[in-house]
Amino acid sequence: MRVVRVVFALVLLSGSLSSAVAPPRSIEISANDEMKYGVTEIRAKAGEPIRLRLVSKGTLPKIAMAHNVVVLKIGTDPAKFIAAGMTNRETDFIAPSMSSAVIAKTPFAGPGETVQVVFTAPAKPGRYPFVCTFAGHFQAGMKGTLIVS
């Protein structure tokens, strides 16, 4: 009888472990030389694991036209965040003083490259801005919103 209980407990435990670690949901965003994201709104559940893939479909050299996705905390002013990082090329145009506002970020992608970041959607429902930090891209409209419910 004890063996049956142990086996039953192991079966229950293995089932709860496999459901506790859900694989991340993949979301793909394209970017181009026109400084636009292919997707500007992402919806996620609070605490949901996300794999965010950025596909650069441009043709201009990476030194002139790279793209990334930086997800910011609620309450962060994207325009001020971008302005603060304009001279920080070595940190992907993210001011060290503003790095605590970043929830997740991809590396820069050049033409034909795909980059990604895996993160957990915030636990707090709300609207989280995301931006491209490459110089001039946010101002050209390269921005969007992660909506967490």
Regions found by a protein language model. Give the residues of each.
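Short beta-strand and strand-turn-strand segments in soluble, beta-rich domains
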Residues: E90-I103
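Bacterial N-terminal signal peptides
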Residues: V6-S16
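N-terminal edge beta-strand
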Residues: A22-I50
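Short, flexible loop/turn segments at beta-strand junctions in immunoglobulin-like
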Residues: R43, L60, F119-A123
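Extracytoplasmic/periplasmic copper-protein system
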Residues: V21-S30, L72-F93, H137-S149
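Short Gly/aromatic-enriched secondary-structure transition segments
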Residues: A64-K73
